[in-house]
Amino acid sequence: MKKEINFLGKRVRRVFMILSLLFVIIGMYFFFTKGLNYSIDFQSGSVIYYKLSSPLNSNQIANLRDIARSFYSKSTIQTGSNGKEVWIRTKFLEENELKRLTSEVEKVIVKYEGREITTIEPTISRELREKAILAAVLAIIVMLVYITVRFRFDFAISAIINEAFVLLATISIFAISQWEVSPSFIAAILTLLGYAINDNIIVFDRIRENSKKYPKEDFTIIANRSINQTLARTLYTVITTLLAITPLLIWGGVVLRPFILAIYLGIIIGTYSTIYIASAILCEWRELQK
C-alpha cells in the first residue's frame, strides 16, 4: 500500500490549528488598529495619472512627492513597472486646487502622452464601500446556505469555520502588509471563498465515500487517507492556477495587483485550510463524540 503523509495526527493538526488562530488574532489586531489601506474607490480622494514619454528619475519622483504633500501630507506617488506611468494620490481636492496641483506637477513632468484625473467625493466613496460590503455578505450567506444543505451538520460547521478562516486570514495579510484594497479585492475574496468551498467539497466527498467503505475504521485515519487520495489533484490545480496568474502578478500593473495578490494568497490559504482547519476540526469533533 502506498505510504501516506500523516497530515492529521493529533499533535500535528493541533499545532497548526493553534498557529492559524494566533495568525488571525495578530491580523485582526492590525485590522482594528491600522485598518485596511483602501483605494480611492473606497475613500474620498483624487488621483492624477500620467502616461509619460520617458521614465522619471529619482529626483523627479522626490520632487513630485514634495509637491503632492504640500497639498496633503499623506499624498503618495506610485510609478508603473516600466517607469512610464505615474499615479499621484491625494485627498479630495476641489477643482481649483486640482488645477494648482497639476500646474505644479507639470513643471516636473514636462512631456507626457496622456493625463487622467479621477475624483471620488466622500458620499460616493461611502456608497461604494457599503454596496461592496453588502454584495460580499449576500454572496457569503448564499455559500453558507449551500454548505449547510450539501453536508451533514458537523461537515457543514467545519466548512463554515474554514470559510471564515480563509476570509479573516486574507484580510489579516492585507491589514499587516497595508497592500491596497480596491473593488477588485472584493471580487477576489468571493472568488477565493468559492475556491475554498470547492476544495472542501472534493475532500469531504472523499471522506464520506471512505467512511461508507470502511465504517469501522478510525475517522482520523479515514480523513487523512482521503486527503492523501485527493492531494495530487489539489496540487495540480493549485500549481497550474498559480502559474497562470503569476505573469499577471509580475507584469499586470498596479490596477490588477490587489486582485491577483488576493487570489494568489487565497488559493494557498484555501488549500492549507482545507487540511488544517476544515478536516482538522472535523477530526476533533468526531473525537469528542466518541
UniProtKB/Swiss-Prot annotation:
Gene3D superfamilies attached to this UniProt entry: Multidrug efflux transporter AcrB transmembrane domain
Membrane topology reported for the UniProt record: Multi-pass membrane protein
Sequence intervals crossing the membrane: 15-35, 131-151, 156-176, 184-204, 234-256, 260-282
GO CC annotation terms, alphabetical: plasma membrane
GO terms assigned for molecular function: protein-transporting ATPase activity
Keywords carried by this UniProt record: Cell inner membrane, Cell membrane, Membrane, Protein transport, Translocation, Transmembrane, Transmembrane helix, Transport
Biological process per Gene Ontology, one example term: protein transport
Span of the signal peptide: none
SUPFAM superfamilies per record: Multidrug efflux transporter AcrB transmembrane domain
Subunit structure, interactors included: Forms a complex with SecD. Part of the essential Sec protein translocation apparatus which comprises SecA, SecYEG and auxiliary proteins SecDF. Other proteins may also be involved.
NCBIfam families reported in the protein's UniProt record: 2A0604s01, transloc_SecF
Physiological role: Part of the Sec protein translocase complex. Interacts with the SecYEG preprotein conducting channel. SecDF uses the proton motive force (PMF) to complete protein translocation after the ATP-dependent function of SecA.
Family under the similarity heading: Belongs to the SecD/SecF family. SecF subfamily.
Name assigned to this protein: Protein translocase subunit SecF
Species this protein is from: Dictyoglomus turgidum (strain DSM 6724 / Z-1310)
Taxonomic path: Bacteria, Pseudomonadati, Dictyoglomota, Dictyoglomia, Dictyoglomales
Gene: secF
